[in-house]
Amino acid sequence: MAAAAAAVAGAGRGGGGGAEPRQERSRARGWAGAERSEGRRMEPGEELEEEDSPGGREDGFTAEHLAAEAMAADMDPWLVFDARMTPATELDAWLAKYPPSQVTRYGDPGSPNSEPVGWIAAYGQGYIPNSGDVQGLQAAWEALQTSGRPVTPGTLRQLAITHQVLSGKWLIHLAPGFKLDHAWAGIARAVVEGRLQVAKVSPRAKEGGRQVICVYTDDFTDRLGVLEADAAIRAAGVKCLLTYKPDVYTYLGIYRANRWHLCPTLYESRFQLGGSARGSRVLDRANNVELT
């Protein structure tokens, strides 16, 4: 299984997690879900359309500012549970040690981390870095913008397919507290048990605000795979609104309120109590069509 994750290699030492060595991190994040310094990432906002920046601020910032914040988070050490190296029996202790509502972005003597942490991540035994041609994608994007040709969802989809930058993620926004920690624990267990591939959660920002959990899939064009991941997230106990964003938008710095008036998220999922056996209703946002 080729994992679609923003995860760093080498985690799992020392009891299943810890701050990652920079050289290990740069070697492992070579694929499309790996929100790297080459890619633009995380736009915070009140609308549930984008990833929240690990910096935690929510409105009034340009895409360039948000990309810079996200890049800084990506360069800082991560806390990672790597099921390829660490027994699953150690997961509960790791989760108890690093609850995302308590891990702070820049470190604090009273928090589990005294040094900055960019992300907290978990990935399963099938994690295989596979980035696609991100540099080629970004070069083609620059050429498209200078050509004056229209920028449309179809254009971006074709760029992603051409350069094999196909990963995407379900986004879950929650305020710091029990619900966030509970949701993250359920998702991390699903990753380690093989029901999901890779996931990460932002640490708590100094300013407060919502944190974001990102759950990755290999291929945003594989609708069945995207829906299966949604079902696994619901089975893990998550009941809030989810939105799904292809990583091609992330790498190209396309956020909500962008100059092309594009919606960066393809799908939204709403929990359905006592309704569908799968536990949610998923909407294709571009076409306003229910998929489940």
From Swiss-Prot:
It holds the Pfam family Bles03. Residues 1-10 have a biased composition (Low complexity). Residues 1-60 are annotated as: Disordered. Residues 35-44 have a biased composition (Basic and acidic residues). Belongs to the UPF0696 family. PANTHER family: UPF0696 PROTEIN C11ORF68. This is UPF0696 protein C11orf68 homolog. It comes from Bos taurus (Bovine).
